UniProtKB/Swiss-Prot annotation:
One of its GO terms (molecular function) is structural constituent of ribosome. Keywords: Ribonucleoprotein, Ribosomal protein, RNA-binding, rRNA-binding. GO terms for biological process: translation. This is Small ribosomal subunit protein uS8. Part of the 30S ribosomal subunit. Contacts proteins S5 and S12. Transmembrane segments: none annotated. One of the primary rRNA binding proteins, it binds directly to 16S rRNA central domain where it helps coordinate assembly of the platform of the 30S subunit.
Length: 130
């Protein structure tokens, strides 16, 4: 059976991996998952992103902890296959008053809400991370 929402699965694996104090998690890779993971790594929510080569590439994410607690307090899917959420540049949300980030899919690629605002771009809100 095929997976309905691979992005929600990725976010759930990150959430569950940190709840279980795992060092790293792995999952099937895709360009979108790698782009989202790279944004999370740039923002400091995960430690490392690695993609294995092969017939079925695997995405390995090294999770990050601070003083024994997970860096990611909450990660939630916003736009989903059954209900896509799009926002204009001036409607992009500020997660936790600017302390968290919204991952946005724009015409210029996957980026944070801050970068999208600076570039003057709107797009699909993929998830909120705090």
């Amino acid at each position: 059976m095929s997976m309905q929402d691979p992005i929600a699965d990725m976010l759930t694996r990150i959430r569950n991996g940190q709840a279980a104090n795992k060092v790293a998690i792995s999952m099937p890779s895709s360009k979108l998952k790698v782009a989202i993971a790279n944004v999370l790594a740039e923002e400091g929510y995960i430690a490392n992103v690695k993609v294995s080569e092969g017939v079925k590439p695997e995405l390995e994410i090294t999770l990050k902890y601070f003083q024994g607690k997970p860096v990611v307090e909450s990660i939630q899917r916003v736009s989903r296959p059954g209900l896509r959420i799009y926002k204009r540049k001036n409607e992009l949300p500020k997660v936790m008053g600017g302390l968290g980030v919204a991952v946005v899919s724009t015409s210029k690629g996957i980026m944070t809400d801050r970068k999208a605002r600076q570039a003057g771009l709107g797009g699909e809100i993929i998830c909120y991370v705090a």
